[in-house]
Amino acid sequence: MIQKNWQELIKPNKVEFASSGRTKATLVAEPLERGFGLTLGNALRRVLLSSLRGAAVTAVQIDGVLHEFSSIPGVREDVTDIVLNIKEIAIKMDGDDAKRMVVRKQGPGVVTAGDIQTVGDIEILNPNHVICTLDEGAEIRMEFTVNNGKGYVPADRNRSEDAPIGLIPVDSLYSPVKKVSYKVENTREGQVLDYDKLTMSIETDGSVTGEDAIAFAARILQDQLSVFVNFDEPQKETEEEAVTELAFNPALLKKVDELELSVRSANCLKNDNIVYIGDLIQKTEAEMLRTPNFGRKSLNEIKEVLASMGLHLGMEVPSWPPENIEDLAKRYEDQY
């Protein structure tokens, strides 16, 4: 069966997120098949840094400034430094259309991202970020163009041919994810000691949580990889269909050693080669009492346990035992 290629690989039964504020989070996923920690960690990291959409300033116009190599009277930073500071403004914006936002301030004092006047669907996430410093009597007015996008776009690609004089294009850092690191360690699952444990640390600008960022990255990978799947998935039976096909109570597939029986009773059943409840209920009381070392006390104990399950000795199960009893027992173990 082709589906065993992926169905029999172990999947993490422990996926935990620990958040430190809105900007930092740690993911722990274990166990993974050996080698999958590195495979998934590296793939998620690359997608997180390159492919998630965010908002950034794409251009700025400063009153009285014609190009980025100018200086502004009364402003301590030159325009080049101001542009570098503008690149670090963290923004969350809804919609895909370009938006404008403005800042106007008089000195003395510091101009921060929190001084920017925004429209309703734009949020400044780092309002204390310094843009420039004004001396006494100085005044500055800046108008920013904001867009949504992904990855890194250099200033040259943000320069339009019909741009007005004085509009300075800015390198756009759209990615909401600022840092990602991961490590892979050994972990244990049952008797296997060399499964992988993946730990990822994510830092964002606050426009998206670390947990959501990983979910988006995983969805991107899922969507990209789906084009390589050249076959239809085998259809899974619904629980109702599966139960209908089974000609007997799924509880009969439960092993008798899972019942809470005394050691004496359990040993007697084992010695009589009674493995499943389906084997047990087809025995009569007389047959059970002929079992070596099996007495009336053990019989009453078993009758009580079966009664609690709606079963009794001496029942007839025409299709018992099924040919694939072990597979059926695994398939229906959550139904008894």
Swiss-Prot record:
The keyword Nucleotidyltransferase applies. The keyword Transcription applies. InterPro entries: DNA-dir_RNA_pol_insert (IPR011262), DNA-dir_RNA_pol_RpoA/D/Rpb3 (IPR011263), DNA-dir_RpoA (IPR011773), RBP11-like (IPR036603), RNAP_asu_C (IPR011260), RNApol_insert_sf (IPR036643). Residues 248-336 are annotated as: Alpha C-terminal domain (alpha-CTD). Residues 1-232 are annotated as: Alpha N-terminal domain (alpha-NTD). Its EC number is 2.7.7.6. SMART domains: RPOLD. Keywords: DNA-directed RNA polymerase, Nucleotidyltransferase, Transcription, Transferase. CDD domains: RNAP_alpha_NTD. It holds the Pfam family RNA_pol_A_bac. One of its GO terms (biological process) is DNA-templated transcription. GO terms for molecular function: DNA binding; DNA-directed RNA polymerase activity; protein dimerization activity. Able to replace the endogenous E.coli protein. DNA-dependent RNA polymerase catalyzes the transcription of DNA into RNA using the four ribonucleoside triphosphates as substrates. Belongs to the RNA polymerase alpha chain family. The alpha-NTD is essential for RNAP assembly and basal transcription, whereas the alpha-CTD is involved in interaction with transcriptional regulators and with upstream promoter elements. The alpha-NTD recognizes upstream AT-rich elements and the alpha-CTD interacts with the transcriptional activator Fis in reconstitution assays in E.coli. This is DNA-directed RNA polymerase subunit alpha. It comes from Rhizobium meliloti (strain 1021).
